[in-house]
Amino acid sequence: LYHANFELFNIYIFPGGFIGVDIFFVITGFLITTILLEEYNNNQSINILNFYERRVRRLIPALLVIILLGTILSYIVLDPTKLKHFSESVFASLGFIANIYFHYFGNIYGTETALMKPLLHLWSLGVEEQFYIILPIGLLIVLKYFNRFSYLLLALVFTLSLSFAYYASSKHVMFNFWMLPSRAWEVLAGSIVAFYLIKYKITSNEI
């Protein structure tokens, strides 16, 4: 609806569409960090392979359905050149690097050219999947060897990412939009909340 640019009296009816992705990243950080922290508190460890398996079982079926539908529609409406680019985006999406592919392909999200790419919206899933790969490993190392400073280290990485995003917002705008380093602070905002709630044993009834 946001990208349709509906207007009423020269006022966009659905403004601020991109903020939905930002909120999605924060919620993702909160939920995944909560799951990992609870597992560590219960077992004094995190089964990383089991975590990866659960993520694959949760995400891949829906991803394959989207790719299948996109493939059918693409063969109907796209010309050979665009179809070649679509095929490349399929492999990038399956390899969890859709955001990287679309960044270096050089398109601006929401433009007319970009709208001819059926899988473009999977860029955010690429960021999410990269976060899934990195977080359990980093969190396990921090909790095992730097537990006293875990909250501080998390806040430090959050600050570094936010600072980089601020710098890149004027110097490297496209990188800032597509890539994990400048998106990590959004995910880590949710992680920080999860750390706080679990550390101080705050239940949902107390919030």
Regions found by a protein language model. Give the residues of each.
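Membrane-interface helix/loop caps of multi-pass membrane proteins
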Residues: 1-207
